[in-house]
Amino acid sequence: MSHLDNGFRSLTLQRFPATDDVNPLQAWEAADEYLLQQLDDTEIRGPVLILNDAFGALSCALAEHKPYSIGDSYISELATRENLRLNGIDESSVKFLDSTADYPQQPGVVLIKVPKTLALLEQQLRALRKVVTSDTRIIAGAKARDIHTSTLELFEKVLGPTTTTLAWKKARLINCTFNEPPLADAPQTVSWKLEGTDWTIHNHANVFSRTGLDIGARFFMQHLPENLEGEIVDLGCGNGVIGLTLLDKNPQAKVVFVDESPMAVASSRLNVETNMPEALDRCEFMINNALSGVEPFRFNAVLCNPPFHQQHALTDNVAWEMFHHARRCLKINGELYIVANRHLDYFHKLKKIFGNCTTIATNNKFVVLKAVKLGRRR
């Protein structure tokens, strides 16, 4: 846990998933402080919109103003709810919207934590363009190293005149005034042909490797299991290309597409609808934090290309949670398959959790591993 003192309220905040690391990562950053310093209770008029509030620092601080928390991360929503509870703040104080929803009209203040991907930022700025006015105060923040010329140009292109502040504690702010500059329409998704298939893959703004198949998934697809039955999970499904391939290779199986990103799950659904509509009755789509709340001993196999970062921070906390959830939800003799960068040494992590691990394939960058849930059902 970490403490954030600001002009609105003193907060105790924790990351989600929680970690027991000796030196845990902090649940807020200097950009959060810097953003809050720009505001005064007396000048906040109209709806307050907060975009990409990773662990709820801004939402908790401004809870008295009933803000809207907007983003593409279910984990961030869970983190914000947990930190509201931790600080004795009514959860209903914050309204949660995903980035594809309609934003509230005529907001008085918009606070944006600059996301990792320009594509998501552009989608969000275009959504804001429909609702902000020239009187809306628009401020974005991030680590100084994460604000580039391209970031500022995007604000200028979509919303209007943009300036940036001096750095403070290695954070920087962007101030923007809306003047409705001319702007061409843009498609909601980016599409590309998947090599070796007849499929066209569609990707919403925040999907990993949006403009083509990432090399880890390409390697994984060469080693996916075939002719399985029962239920298979594509955990952290992204655009669903792994799940699509599983549907094709395992015609007797049902595939459950799971991701914490609403845009990823929407992309997966769209890709099944457009490429294998006949398989829709063998699919389930789930926005979730890994497999939280899913009954144990349910699945025959789980396949996963786990992330090794959370927002801008490098961490294996999310992957570790995915592995534990997979073990809990697998049937006896059910199998977990993962692909990962070799340097992450997931072999020993899986062996610690499952008691076994087998290397299926390896190249100079990636490894495909399999772990089996052994033992009797208790």
From Swiss-Prot:
Main location: cytoplasm
Family: Belongs to the methyltransferase superfamily. RlmG family.
Classification via Pfam families: MTS
Gene3D superfamilies: Vaccinia Virus protein VP39
Protein name per its UniProtKB record: Ribosomal RNA large subunit methyltransferase G
Entry keywords, A to Z: Cytoplasm, Methyltransferase, rRNA processing, S-adenosyl-L-methionine, Transferase
Coiled coil spans: none
